[in-house]
Regions:
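Extreme N-terminal basic, low-complexity initiation segments
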Residues: 2-7
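Short, Lys/Arg-enriched N-terminal segments with co-localized hydrophobic residues
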Residues: 9-21
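A general structural motif
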Residues: 21, 48-53, 115, 146
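C-terminal and late-domain segments of enzyme folds
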Residues: 21-50, 59-75, 164-244
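Portal/gating segments that form or line small-molecule/metal binding sites
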Residues: 60-127, 131
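Class I SAM-dependent methyltransferase SAM-binding "motif I" and its flanking Rossmann-like core
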Residues: 120-196
Length: 244
């Protein structure tokens, strides 16, 4: 088997989809309740207070209503309404993907490998996907078997095969809505009651009809956990699975 360095980008894509072993906690709005927090601790195998974290705000820069600006600072500093960085980590740093191509790999790869959890903010999933590829972070996924990826909205959607046209904002060079495909289902976050901010069930059903694959709609009290290909839903709220 050829090493990743000798493969084309397309070949590397299929390799890391097949080999990715990072543990996933895919949320709509962060660690919003006790059930999701308990699932996180279970994935870590130790208390949050004994765990190191790196937050990834990159997705925010691609979304016109989120960043750059105050939103990124609120996320990093733990002042947002979506609990991620303020959970009481042993250590917390920032991993800015747009900066990584301009610095030596030795400056950041060992740091990522030694970190317990990666916290990916919401924002634009296609922008985040682009920079996960450009930075080389996605190529590390097969070696991060002990690492937990906690996604928030776009930070969760980036792990899916595609996000659907309804969620396309920033457009990648490919022009399509495909994302990393680490999992085999798509996600519609922010499921909400009719008339409330977010995506209604009717809107989620219409979105799912255009996905042409398995999908989940999850509200802000729900997360999807994926470990070694096994998927389960942790929820104190509302969610729905759409078969392919």
């Amino acid at each position: 088997m050829l090493p990743l360095s000798q493969l084309s980008r397309r070949e590397r894509h299929y390799r890391y989809v097949q080999e990715a072993r990072v543990k996933l906690l895919l949320t709509s709005a962060g660690v919003k309740n006790t059930s999701i927090k308990n699932a996180l601790v279970d994935l870590l195998g130790k208390p949050i207070a004994d765990s190191s974290a790196l937050c990834i705000p990159t997705a925010m820069y691609g979304h016109p209503r989120v960043g750059p600006g105050a939103g990124a600072w609120q996320f990093i500093s733990g002042q947002s309404e979506n609990p991620m960085c303020e959970l009481g980590w042993k250590s917390l740093g920032v991993l800015e993907l747009t900066a990584l191509p301009s610095i030596d790999e030795e400056r950041w790869i060992p740091l990522v490998r030694d970190t317990d959890v990666l916290l990916a903010s919401g924002g634009d999933a296609l922008y985040l996907c682009h920079w996960m590829r450009e930075s080389g972070l996605v190529d590390l996924l097969p070696s991060l078997s002990e690492t937990v990826w906690v996604g928030l909205s776009a930070g969760s959607m980036v792990m899916t095969p595609r996000i659907g046209e309804d969620f396309v904002g920033w457009k990648p060079p490919s022009g399509d809505d495909s994302t990393l495909g680490i999992v085999n289902f798509s996600i519609c976050p922010h499921l909400a009651q009719e008339g409330m901010p977010g995506n209604s069930m009717a809107e989620a059903e219409q979105w799912a009809a255009g996905i042409a694959g398995p999908a989940y709609a999850i509200d802000d009290e729900t997360a999807i956990r994926v470990v070694d290909g096994t998927v389960d839903v942790i929820s104190e709220g509302q969610w729905k699975r759409f078969p392919s």
